[in-house]
Regions:
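A short, proline-enriched helix->beta-strand linker immediately N-terminal to the Walker B motif
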Residues: 109-113
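ABC ATPase NBD coupling module
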Residues: 4, 17-33, 59, 180-185, ...
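P-loop NTP-binding/switch modules centered on Walker-like glycine-rich loops
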Residues: 116, 120-124, 128-207
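Conserved ABC ATPase "signature" region
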Residues: 15-16, 58, 67-85, 194-195
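Conserved ABC transporter NBD signature motif
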Residues: 8-16
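Short catalytic/signature loops enriched in Gly
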Residues: 177-245
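Conserved ABC ATPase signature
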Residues: 90-94, 98
Length: 245
């Protein structure tokens, strides 16, 4: 761990994993993996694709022989849409989308139950983003993996999510199904976010411009936020109780 949490708990399947350490933490990490935001910085430039994907297997002692590991690497490359002969190439020889496919293959190496996707498409060209999202959806359907998908692109969130949590300055303000959130948002911040999603039709966009919810006021400091609801200073629906809870 880099830092210990100062407050709160992290529960996974009802188990408190906030302060796990040693072998218990290592076992937990095997089941939960992470896809990083930047495919250019998250791959070791000195390692080949095969070495990058194989590394988690070596760390966690997966498979008994090198041949078994190599076969698994080839299988993972096929799953993410890359060729088996890419194993001997280095990250700089690939495009951003291909690098993110390599990252996804590495993430799948340990057969995790849960994957945290930390804005996995925000650093990619728009033309590639949909391909990566569809790849993630196909993998989820075939392997039954759960995702925690962190994103600010609400159109993509709608496309991939079953449940959506909306956060403002680190505080959960709304949690519901994807269908319910987009059809009937409850929190003023959620409504403002959804009203800001552009529509690729100038006429419709012009008509709905007057209905857009424009947030006013300054964003409070995350380290010195006001008492009560953190959104109160920018919310037109704020009441006295919002300053308390």
């Amino acid at each position: 761990k880099i830092n210990e949490p100062t407050d709160g708990k992290i529960l996974v399947n009802g188990e408190d994993i906030t302060h796990l350490s040693g072998q218990k933490l290592k076992k937990f990490r095997k089941n939960i993996q992470l896809i990083f935001q930047d495919p250019y910085a998250s791959l070791n430039p000195r390692m080949t694709v095969g070495e990058i994907i194989r590394e988690p297997m070596v760390i966690h002692h997966i498979y008994q022989t090198r041949k078994e590991q190599d076969d698994r690497v080839a299988e993972l490359l096929k799953i993410v849409g890359l060729k088996p002969d890419h194993v001997r190439r280095y990250p700089h020889e690939f495009s951003g989308g291909q690098r993110q496919r390599i990252s996804i293959a590495r993430t799948l190496a340990l057969n995790p139950e849960f994957i945290v996707c930390d804005e996995p498409i925000s650093a990619l060209d728009v033309s590639i983003q949909a391909q990566i999202i569809n790849l993630l959806k196909n993998i989820q359907k075939e392997l039954g993996i759960a995702y925690l998908f962190i994103a600010h692109d609400l159109s993509m969130v709608k496309h991939i999510s079953d449940r959506v949590a909306v956060l403002y300055l680190g505080t959960l303000v709304e949690l519901t199904t994807s269908e319910e959130l987009y059809a009937n948002p409850q929190h003023p911040y959620t409504r403002a976010l959804l009203s800001a999603i552009p529509i690729p039709d100038p006429k419709i966009e012009q008509e709905r411009d007057a209905k857009k919810i424009r947030l006013e006021g300054e964003v409070p400091s995350p380290i010195n936020s006001p008492a009560g609801c953190k959104f109160q200073g920018r919310c037109k629906c704020a009441m006295p109780i919002c300053r308390q809870e």
